[in-house]
Amino acid sequence: MDLRKLLGRMASMAVAMALPLIGQAQTFPTKPVRLVVPQAGGTGNDVLARALAEKLSQAWKQPVVVENKPGANGTLAISYVLGQPADGYTLFFAGVSNLSFNPYLYPKLPYQPAKDLTGVAMLANSPFVFVASPSLHVQTLQDFVRLAKARPGEISFASGGIGNSTHLAMELVAERTGITMQHVPFNGTGGSTSLMNGQTPVMMNVVAGVQPFIAGKKLVPLAVTGDRRLAALPSVPTFKELGYDVQVPGWYAIVARAGTPPAVVQQINADINHIQDDPQFKEKLGFQFLDAIKGPPSEVERYMKRDADAWGPVI
């Protein structure tokens, strides 16, 4: 057999071997896909998840249905996902607390993130802003720290739930500023309501969760996380500027049950990365003050491990 025929046969064999994988990827999805969100409807996470679901539905020509299952810092939602087939038809909208913090918060956690879940795609990251109710009569972080030290343990703070990023962020603020506060956890949007009426007068939240209230003078921004000031809040200093090391991860990712076919994972990853270049989706990220994160599925594991290693000792 001459070299030309041999190379031709080898090329044919390579194509034949690749066809099953291509076919598998091209035939997904053939039915509706569920995107499970561990927060209530109307929250910032829910808004982002629905924006993504809309674009995936358009790309796949199949409905992507958002299902809200709040509670236990995502544990209920993840348990539900793990009870479904590992086929890519049930995806989980994860935050850093679900994947990196929960193993340290719950001794009997019913799942192991690195073992039971597989990364699909990173989505975005958000800075946090520390806000206060006008009823507290503080205008700067220094004002608040002085007040809290004069009233140790009297001031309460709201969060999105025990172990939520908003909870741990405030615990970090308390530790770094040398103050003590009472924690009042909420599910869904109750924390913002309690914050504005002064019942729990301070909170740390992603910018999108409080920006409308800041603009409406219903909340006072005191400091932001990150290395630089935010374009949306140029007059608000960073914790770093004020001498406090308060860095809080606020990323979101899509994960699936471990064992999901790699070809399906790769297709979903490629489609989400493509959606992040969509002008309408980028605009929606901008409305929520989110920075897109793109990369292969392995990026999810990298972020998850990085923040588990960093925050485990703190927790």
Explain the meaning of each model-derived region.
Residues 98-108, 171-176, 202-234, 312:
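A ligand-binding cleft/hinge motif common to bilobed small-molecule-binding domains
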Residues 83-89, 104-191, 202, 239, ...:
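Hinge/capping helix and adjacent helix->loop/strand transition within the periplasmic-binding protein
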Residues 25-115, 154, 162, 177-204, ...:
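N-terminal (or domain-start) structured segment
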